[in-house]
Each structure stands twice: as structure tokens, then as C-alpha cells.
Regions:
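Short, solvent-exposed loop/turn segments at secondary-structure junctions
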Residues: 27-30, 51-54, 110-114, 148-151, ...
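Redox-cofactor binding/interface segments in oxidoreductases and associated redox assembly factors
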Residues: 23-24, 107, 175
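Secretory-pathway glycan-assembly enzymes, especially type II membrane glycosyltransferases
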Residues: 1-91
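Donor nucleotide-activated moiety binding/catalytic core segment of transferases
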Residues: 12-15, 135-191, 196-197
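Conserved catalytic-core segment of nucleotide-activated headgroup transferases in glycan assembly
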Residues: 100-151
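Leloir-type glycosyltransferase catalytic cores
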Residues: 57-102, 201-247
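Short amphipathic alpha-helices and their capping/turn segments at secondary-structure boundaries
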Residues: 37-40, 91-102, 132-136
């Protein structure tokens, strides 16, 4: 693959290991099981999927778009690297100036395959167990917001209510590995998580009554996430390879 060092690239439809580092795109098919097997047997792997910013939009298919690439995780977990702001700033996204102080705890489940991969449970079980845990700590109202899906596709472009609008009365967002975590901190909403694969926080549910939000921290996290996603040109040039820290 152009821009990717280390010899030949194999597309392993038969899932037979042929050496080198494995790379998985999304959780299509049995990728969630393959990642677990690969991690146990062969070590380091890469994961690519939708980006944190600059997502491909089917309504504007010719626009430049990005894809996140993460090493040994479905998300960038080293979120306090103090990366420069240039890549994030080019998107023109404004970080909220103050915290949203609403009432609702909003659960944002990931896909069923994602929950199986990062939490060894189904989406339904995650929702039920998370609600049960939260209710032992607080009596705040809880609402589940599923990822928008319509006409065989998913994502922000098919949402009936934009996420930023839907969290205007949020106290916090609870997620495992959902991309909604990123949009939450951009909009001034704190996040707590149930896994170590969350792209913006490591705070668990036990911290839910003390959770807070800081604009400078949100901006620094977004700066790092913008350095964890790449255009096709940046993959061809070798920039993505270098930024992924592959040795």
C-alpha cells in the first residue's frame, strides 16, 4: 500500500495471518471477533473508521474527508499529548465557552459489535447494566439516545434532531466508545465512560455526581484527535504511518 512501509499488503478474506501488522476497517462482518483473536495471538494492530471531524458525507461525496487510524484500540486513547491546534482549527469548530448545566443523563450506546469488543456484552445489556449502576448513585433522569440510522446508513446526516440540539438539557453524557463523546465535550457537556476505549475521558460512573467540564481541556483533546485522522493523500504520503507511531 502506497505510503505504508514494511512490505506487501495482503487483503485476507480468509483471515489467515500472513505476517506484518493487522489493520481492520470498522466492525463490519466478524471484525470485532477477529480483533480479539489477532490481539491475543499477534500483538499490535491498527483500526480505521469514521473520523472525529471531517466525516465523509454522502450528500457531498466529492468533499475532502478523513478517516481515523488508531493503534491497538478503536479510539485514540493518549488524549493529553499537547498536539498543536492547526489540524483541528482548520475545521472551524468552536468549543463551547461554558458548561451546559442541564438535568438529563444521556446514554449514548455504541453498536452491538462495539459493545461486544470493548465490554464483552451486548448493547442491550450495556444499556440495562449502566442504567442500574447510575440509579444506585443518583436520581437524575436518564434518557437513551441511539445512534441515528435511516435508509441503510447511519450518522449525523440522518439524525432527525442534531446531537448538539438534543443535549441542550444534558447534565452529562455516558458512553462506552461512542463518537458522541467528542461532540458532547465540544458542546460543553461532560462525559463519563464505562470502558477504557473512550476517546475523551477515563472517568467512570462512580464520578458522575462530581463530573465537570473545562473548555481548555476539551480543546486540547480535540487537537490530539485531529492528529489521529487522515485524508487519503496523507495516507499515500506516509504522514499517517509516521503519526500512528508504527515501529
Amino acid at each position: 500500500m502506497q505510503g505504508w512501509k514494511g512490505g506487501d499488503t495482503h487483503i485476507e478474506h480468509d483471515y489467515e495471518y500472513q505476517g506484518g501488522m493487522g489493520m481492520f476497517w470498522g466492525l463490519v462482518g466478524q471484525n470485532h471477533q477477529m480483533i480479539k483473536t489477532y490481539d491475543a495471538k499477534h500483538g499490535s494492530w491498527l483500526f480505521s473508521d469514521m473520523p472525529y471531524f471531517g466525516r465523509w458525507n454522502p450528500h457531498r461525496p466529492d468533499d475532502e474527508c478523513y478517516w481515523r487510524i488508531c493503534k491497538n484500540s478503536v479510539h485514540q486513547r493518549d488524549i493529553f499529548r499537547n498536539d498543536p491546534p492547526d489540524r483541528f482549527d482548520k475545521f472551524g469548530i468552536s468549543i463551547a465557552k461554558k458548561r451546559v448545566k442541564g438535568d438529563e443523563i444521556i446514554l449514548c450506546p455504541s453498536s452491538n459489535n462495539m459493545h461486544i469488543l470493548v465490554g464483552n456484552m451486548t448493547q442491550r445489556d450495556w444499556i440495562l447494566s449502566t442504567i442500574e449502576t447510575i440509579q444506585k448513585i443518583t436520581d437524575r433522569p436518564i434518557r437513551v439516545r441511539h445512534k441515528p440510522r435511516k435508509n441503510g446508513t447511519s450518522g449525523p446526516h440522518v439524525a432527525d434532531i442534531p446531537f448538539a440540539e438534543d443535549i441542550k438539557n444534558a447534565y452529562c453524557v455516558v458512553a462506552s466508545a461512542s463518537m458522541a463523546s467528542v461532540e458532547a465535550i465540544i458542546n460543553g457537556v461532560p462525559v463519563v465512560t464505562t470502558s477504557n476505549h473512550n476517546p475523551v475521558t477515563s472517568l467512570g460512573i462512580s464520578c458522575i455526581e462530581a463530573v465537570d467540564w473545562y473548555p481548555d481541556e476539551a480543546k486540547n483533546i480535540c487537537n490530539t484527535l485531529a492528529y489521529s485522522q487522515f485524508t487519503s493523500k496523507e495516507m499515500y504520503s506516509g504522514f499517517a504511518y509516521e503519526m500512528c507511531g508504527i515501529r
